[in-house]
Amino acid sequence: MKNKEVGVYVHIPFCKQKCYYCDFVSYCQKDSIIERYINAVKKEIRLQNIQAPITTIYIGGGTPSYIESDYIREIIGEIKKKNVIEKPEITIEVNPGTVTIDKLRIYRSCGINRLSIGLQTTNDELLKQIGRIHNYEQFLETYKMARKVGFKNINIDLMLGLPNQRIKDLKDSLEEVIKLNPKHISVYSLIVEEGTPIANKIQKGELVLPDEETERNMYWYVKNTLELNGYKHYEISNFAKEGYESKHNQNCWKQKQYFGFGAAAHSYRDITRYSNTPNIEEYIKNIEAERLDKNRTIHEIQKEYDMEKEYMLLGLRQIEGININDFKAKFVKNPIYVFRNELKKLTDEELIVVEGSTIKLTNKGIDLANLVWEEFV
């Protein structure tokens, strides 16, 4: 790993209130433990030997903007003691209702140059139904403050397929967001996870999801509208102005290495994928005892064929698809031969197309992407 670039992910698992659809590792009403947790994260960073240059840092959650900005500054300061390139991409996730202009100024001063703001929808009634703590007006205030303090590279998160969401609601949201001219827009379909409050409400009939056809129509409306407005569709759920694609996420999709710090954080190093314990108390205790290994669960030690399959799966998340020559350069094999059976099946079903030196999803394949990815799991 000496000459390979790496990314860093830091997990801040604290929230003001958990959204009704959220299945991520996050905790409310744990404020008393925040300082110990931040100290543990800083210690974990110190204990980790990272030789390779760090090109991207991503601070996610939870709601990282919920905690004091000084904690964020301390974490970034600790990472910067490592081999960080001169101008890394540093992203932090921000939720409206949890930031002030002073917090944003501190983010800028410690090198954060990309914000990801969770809006989800401009419809206040829908925001309430999914358990968001903010309204659209608070989002606008956050966005304007961010621009005022000098943030140019801003992502806005939207969601489609929400309970009781109509195509008109989505059109209105998209129209308002496009007016703001952010550099990046992510649009995710709601995934109903078992055991979440939203799943329980749907089961009881209190909330109704749009049908599959409506949800797909929403997706294609988003894709077409954003492309007409100068956004490049570069990954299933992501759109960017030229040159503003998320470098951190792109590196993950290109199978590059990354170190995860904090409870529940995932890492990919050499041929190993592992994650830290999701239990905050256990995480802190093990870090304080300098037992990094006790926090870790190894999910996979990859053989070459595992890496090849994963390369295909991750590559087919990207709209430009897989460059056959890049695959050959990495694995000294031709993917057309290695995956001849899978590719024939997917081509026959018109889910992928092989064009010149590229393998990519068709429009039908974008709609049925899960079926495509299943072939490489």
Where are these regions (language model features)?
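C-terminal scaffold of the Radical SAM
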Residues: 3-5, 26-48, 55-333
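Local cysteine-cluster metal-coordination motifs and their immediate loop/turn environment
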Residues: 13-26
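Minor-groove-contacting beta-hairpin "wing" of winged helix-turn-helix DNA-binding domains
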Residues: 358-362
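Short, amphipathic alpha-helical interaction segments positioned at domain boundaries
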Residues: 364-377
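Short amphipathic alpha-helical interaction segments
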Residues: 333-345
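A short, conserved structural fragment
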Residues: 347-357
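Short active-site neighborhood of thiol/selenol oxidoreductases, capturing the structured segment around
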Residues: 8-11
